[in-house]
């Protein structure tokens, strides 16, 4: 009998070991070894979280490290998401639609703000007084970003297209410099650089339209969300903590923005004033705004043939992660 029971106990031990290994694998799958997150001067939450180390604290017990990557614009954030350089990236709504329409496998899981972060900017002594005056002029804009798409939509309101102007593709801070130096006639600005141009350079906002500013989206790679859904939830909890902290501490937030972005405190305060943090769950409001904006992507032939950007909007926006987190915080 002893050999029989010995074999039974040996078999049981193998089963227990296998189950333990499976549970260990499941635990590992719930939390990756590293989470790569972008931070951007146009995303106050990312700056606050990085400043306080809240993501590092949230995942410390799991042994998960946080790697921060600077995004200078939506184009960079979306490139990093596409290449897998980051798992979470901060980008404008319409730029995110364009990226997904052209094959970038991302979902929008959180709205970090409703900003007025872009406008068309000219020098204080510029003779340009209207959008129509831009015909034949040089406009600095970062392709694949909200300011670039804002420019196209603005031109369409007066019957112009990008063929009627010369778009000079420069990253946002370089666009400000080019405007100040007279290398371009106008610039599709982005905060905090736009606020700095206003306050420090005396630049003038030629055309403003809050409705043409699309939302600040936190996007996640589809592969990451599928493999680590619990990690996505935990990251969003930290983002929502930062959002609430910003609302309660505007002065401290402005100082963090100023320090991180290397701008003056008045510039940071102006940037912050142009953000609404009240609606963090992506949903019908964002869908409607983006579907209204989507035709410019087709009209300017920015998407692949046969792709309907309006349909892409529905596949991009995923409120399932943020909704319970925000509801629980109220």
Task: For each feature predicted by the language model, list its residue ranges.
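Secondary-structure end/capping motifs
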Residues: 228-304
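Solvent-exposed, polar/charged alpha-helical surfaces in well-ordered, non-transmembrane soluble domains
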Residues: 53, 57, 79, 83, ...
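Pocket-lining segment of extracytoplasmic ligand-binding domains
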Residues: 94, 167-168, 173-260
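N-terminal secretory signal peptides that target proteins for export/translocation
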Residues: 1-7
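Short, glycine-/small- and polar/acidic-enriched structural segments
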Residues: 30-161, 166-169, 185-188, 205, ...
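Conserved C-terminal helix/tail region of periplasmic/extracytoplasmic solute-binding proteins
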Residues: 298-330
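Bacterial N-terminal signal peptides
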Residues: 11-23
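Sec/Tat signal peptide C-region and signal peptidase I cleavage site
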Residues: 25-29
């Amino acid at each position: 009998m002893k050999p029989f029971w010995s074999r039974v106990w040996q078999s049981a031990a193998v089963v227990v070991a296998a189950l333990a290994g499976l549970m260990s694998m499941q635990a590992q799958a719930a939390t990756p070894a590293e989470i790569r997150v972008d931070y951007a001067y146009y995303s106050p939450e990312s700056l606050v979280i990085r400043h306080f180390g809240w993501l590092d604290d949230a995942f410390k017990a799991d042994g998960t490290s946080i790697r921060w990557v600077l995004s200078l614009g939506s184009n960079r954030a979306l490139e990093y998401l596409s290449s897998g350089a980051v798992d979470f990236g901060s980008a404008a709504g319409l730029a995110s639609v364009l990226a997904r329409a052209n094959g970038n496998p991302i979902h929008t899981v959180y709205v970090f703000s409703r900003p007025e972060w872009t406008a068309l900017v000219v020098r204080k002594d510029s003779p340009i007084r209207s959008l129509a005056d831009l015909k034949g002029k040089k406009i600095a804009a970062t392709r694949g970003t909200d300011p670039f798409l804002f420019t196209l939509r603005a031109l369409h309101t007066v019957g112009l297209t990008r063929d009627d102007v010369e778009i000079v593709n420069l990253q946002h801070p370089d666009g400000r410099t080019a405007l100040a130096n007279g290398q371009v006639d106008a610039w599709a600005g982005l905060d905090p650089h736009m606020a700095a141009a206003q306050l420090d350079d005396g630049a003038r906002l030629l055309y403003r339209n809050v409705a043409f500013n699309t939302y600040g989206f936190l996007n996640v790679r589809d592969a990451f969300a599928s493999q680590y859904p619990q990690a996505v939830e935990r990251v969003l909890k930290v983002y929502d903590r930062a959002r609430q902290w910003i609302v309660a501490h505007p002065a401290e937030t402005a100082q963090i923005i100023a320090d991180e972005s290397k701008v003056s405190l008045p510039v940071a305060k102006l940037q912050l004033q142009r953000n609404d943090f009240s609606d963090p769950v992506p949903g019908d409001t964002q869908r409607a705004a983006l579907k209204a904006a989507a035709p410019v992507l087709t009209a300017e032939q920015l998407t692949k043939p046969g792709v309907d950007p309006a349909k892409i909007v529905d596949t991009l926006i995923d409120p399932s992660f943020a909704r319970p987190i925000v509801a629980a915080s109220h």
